[in-house]
UniProtKB/Swiss-Prot annotation:
Catalysis: reaction(s): a quinone + NADH + 5 H(+)(in) = a quinol + NAD(+) + 4 H(+)(out)
Protein localization: Cell inner membrane
Cysteine-cysteine disulfides: none
Record GO cellular component, one term: plasma membrane
The name this protein goes by in its record: NADH-quinone oxidoreductase subunit D
EC assignment: 7.1.1.-
Encoding gene per record: nuoD
């Protein structure tokens, strides 16, 4: 009998050995930045998936409380650094709502144009690295070639490829040249062909489908429970897009469709992103057509924006205004506001509390990736280890905005 109990102990010891913990990341190529997951595996099946975040935490929200509204703008480029201008947009909208500034029409169109370029930048990176995570080599090379062209458009508008600081409260920093508008138009004509090539390579690819179909399925209840937004919602069959449901800027004038999925799995989210790039290209083309007709200023001239260069050379008041604007900054009336934009990753929101001074009292940043990553344990449970990287890929996480 004593022998038997010993034998049982050995058996339970054997069973104890079956669940083992491994670290996924932070330097894993599929970890998309500095994600660290502690995975508990039963054989190859994921029992628990524990995300450890904070490796890129810079205290953005706290830093913002000690700087002027304009000095805070560049912090937004450094959140989701894959598509920087979309974040600046939310910050500018929040300030404009509190101060009651009307943005000139041309500036509004330029904002929409560059927000959509940002969406294409983001989805190109996501779709192609998603393919790379499951073993394809060609798509990332093609995707980065196209992103390079768009980065050049960023650079020609603002002088920077990545951290543009181009959107300003009251408009955009400077006007686009006619030549740039022509070049973007030329790119937009050729881009659908690139998407067709990507489509041909991935959409019906047997291996790509096996790795993505029925992986990470999300239901309507999950969406409401976890607070998903963006492609995570649309992939499950709900046409929820802030550009259509709560139009901001001048999105209500544009003709575009909202792609939705059916099963809510990784594959449907991939298809949504592919189609969204096509729709963004349509919006870009409509924008360019409108920009050719709409002339005018790109900044609402007043207390929020600097005076024109020429004026500063002749007017003392303009010079003083310029100096005060960049040292002390403008004052925003006391109040609170929530401004949200449909960023490429989902609903990016800024909850701004102003106390009437030249600095925000408190700014809360709602990063879509944060809410998506929360659910990784729930989504990945019961999947295989290899599926975890496919799931992370379609959650579309970037750590600038998650850790902020």
């Amino acid at each position: 009998m004593a022998m038997d109990t010993k034998f049982d102990d050995v058996l339970t010891g054997e069973q104890k050995l079956r669940n083992f913990n491994i670290n996924f990341g932070p330097q894993h190529p599929a970890a998309h930045g500095v994600l660290r997951l502690v995975l508990e595996l039963d054989g190859e099946v994921v029992e628990r998936c524990d995300p450890h975040i904070g490796l890129l935490h810079r205290g953005t929200e706290k830093l913002m409380e000690s700087r002027t509204y304009l000095q805070n703008l560049p912090y937004f480029d450094r959140l989701d650094y894959v598509a920087p201008m979309n974040q600046e947009h939310a910050w500018c909208l929040a300030i404009e709502r509190l101060t009651g500034v009307a943005v000139p029409r041309r500036a509004s169109l330029i904002r929409v144009l560059y927000s959509e370029i940002g969406r294409v930048l983001n989805h190109l990176l996501n779709v192609t690295t998603q393919a790379m995570d499951v073993g394809a080599l060609t798509p990332p090379l093609w995707g980065f070639e196209e992103r390079e062209k768009l980065m050049v458009f960023y650079e020609r508008a603002s002088g920077a490829r990545l951290h543009a600081a181009y959107f300003r409260p009251g408009g955009v920093h400077q006007d686009l040249t006619p030549r740039l508008i022509e070049d973007i138009e030329e790119w937009a004509e050729h881009f659908p062909k690139v998407l067709d090539d990507l489509d041909e390579l991935l959409t019906e690819n047997r291996i790509f489908k096996q790795r993505n179909v029925d992986i990470g399925i999300i239901s309507e209840k999950d969406i409401l429970d976890w607070g998903f937004s963006g492609v995570m919602v649309r992939g499950s069959g709900f046409a929820w897009d802030l550009r259509r449901s709560q139009p901001y800027e001048c999105y209500d004038e544009f003709d575009f469709q909202i792609p939705v999925g059916k099963n809510g799995d990784c594959y449907d989210r991939y298809l949504c992103r592919m189609e969204e790039m096509r729709q963004s290209t349509r919006i870009i083309q409509q924008c360019l057509a409108k920009l050719r007709v709409e002339k005018g200023d790109v900044l609402a001239r007043g207390k929020l924006t600097p005076p024109p260069r020429g004026e500063m050379k002749t007017s003392m008041e303009a010079l003083i205004h310029h100096f005060k604007l960049y040292t002390e900054g403008f004052h925003v009336p006391a109040g609170e506001v929530y401004a949200a934009v449909e960023a490429p990753k989902g609903e990016f929101g800024v909850y701004l509390v102003a106390d009437g001074t030249n600095r925000p009292y408190r700014a809360k940043i709602r990063a879509p990736g944060f809410l998506h990553l929360q659910a990784i344990d729930y989504i990945a449970k019961g999947h295989l280890l290899a599926d975890v990287s496919a799931i992370i890929g379609t959650l579309d996480v970037v750590f600038g905005e998650i850790d902020r």
